[in-house]
Amino acid sequence: MPPVRLRLTRETERAAVERAAATLRGGGIALLPAEGVYGFHALASSEPAVERLRAMKARAPERGFIGLLARAEDLDAYAEAPRLALELASAHWPGPLTLVLAARPDAPNALRASDGTIALRCPGSEFLRAVVAATGGLVLSTSANEPGSPPAVRLDAVAADSYDLGIDGGDLSGIPSTLVRVVSGYLEILRAGAVRIAEPPLDGGAVPP
């Protein structure tokens, strides 16, 4: 059965949020527009959906997915956030900045990498934040492209048999979120992206916004 597709406009946004949240709560995969690229999304509490994501992305169990937060203040519920991370979140969230942090003991396994870290973002997209809030849970996100392929910037670039619901937000920029690791008070830029971050000196100095 082909997936359901909805065009995201000001008039359809509320219905799109409700449909996306219902799809995720039902254990489905939703293809949604983020700030720069399209991504597959699943509810972290749905084991079948998580395993389906892993199979689609050929993702080993020791590699976690990005977790999306509806509110920046939810960060502490899942990660150990040092001062440096809190400064970055305060300056750039909501926005296209993904923070890699030490996981709290009760953080979902689907987020965890083998080194004990998790990746979190409070997205700049109001639509995406509304979807996460409407699910009442933590939403996993991963880019909607095959490993080694360019990111998907159009809904039609993604195979229709890979998702249950697609929300068409038009053509996107193709610029991913900036990926920054902040563990033990030190910062490392893992991937350059939409947010420019200056690496501080190793004395743990503050990061300018």
What does each of the following model-derived ranges do?
Residues 1-209:
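Active-site-adjacent structural elements in enzyme catalytic cores
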